Every structure is written in C-alpha cells, then in structure tokens.
Amino acid sequence: MQREFPEVPLVGVGAIIIEHARVVLVKRAHPPLQAEWSIPGGVLEVGELVRQAAIREAREETGLTVEPGELLGVYDRVLRDAGKRVQYHYVLIDFLCRRVAGDLTAASDAAEVRWFVREELPALNLAEDTLDVIRKGFAKL
C-alpha cells in the first residue's frame, strides 16, 4: 500500500478517547503530519473492520484498550506537495471511544502521547476537522 502519492484514497480510522473532560492526542513520529499533535489512528488493514481498526490503532499508539462507540464523523484529508500534486489522501472515519483498560504510553507511530483539556487545544494548531470532531466528542459526554 503506497501512502505517499497514492493511486487511490486510503481509509483511516481515528479514536477520539475522552475521559474526565480530557482528550488523548498523539504527536506523530512519521509523515504525514510528523511532529504534530493528532487523534490516535491509522490506516485499515485488509480484511479489518473499521471498529477493529480503531481498537488496534488506539492500543498501538497509546497503550490503551478502547471500546469504539458512536461514529462522530467522516472526513477527507488531502495534502498536496509544492507542485499541487496529491501527496496524501485519506478518508478518515472517527469514533468516540471509551477507555476500558491500559495506561497511557507512547508507542508505534507516536513520538509522544498525553491528555489535553479543551482549553489547551487552540494552542496546538490542530486541523479544523480535527478540532471539529473533538468538539463533537466533548458534546456527547
């Protein structure tokens, strides 16, 4: 599967993990969005169901075992290079998730992982669709 300059869009999942008025974000260790804070998540594997992928990605990136609940949104993430070619194209399916076990630990693609309260989010320069889905998650609690 070619992530950079793909021939077709890739399907990804996001796990919006909210607990005690805080949300889990990971600092990406690899492109795209390397060194930026983001929702835990990643690309589906062949034969994997979207909720299974959300569970796997949350565990891989945060050390937490989660239970995916409500679908919060489906978003397009298209990033272009300097020549305006599509460098990355993802269709992202984001679920509100509840932690059922585990301790927060950066793993896999995450350089860092931590809990954030709402008031900290504006300073992180998150993408507008990322902020939107996090707001939706907070509104459901």
PLM regions and their residue ranges:
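NUDIX/MutT-family hydrolases
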Residues: 94, 105-137
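Conserved Nudix-box catalytic region and its N-terminal flanking loop in Nudix hydrolases
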Residues: 22-60
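Acidic, metal-coordinating catalytic segment for phosphate/diphosphate chemistry
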Residues: 1-14, 85
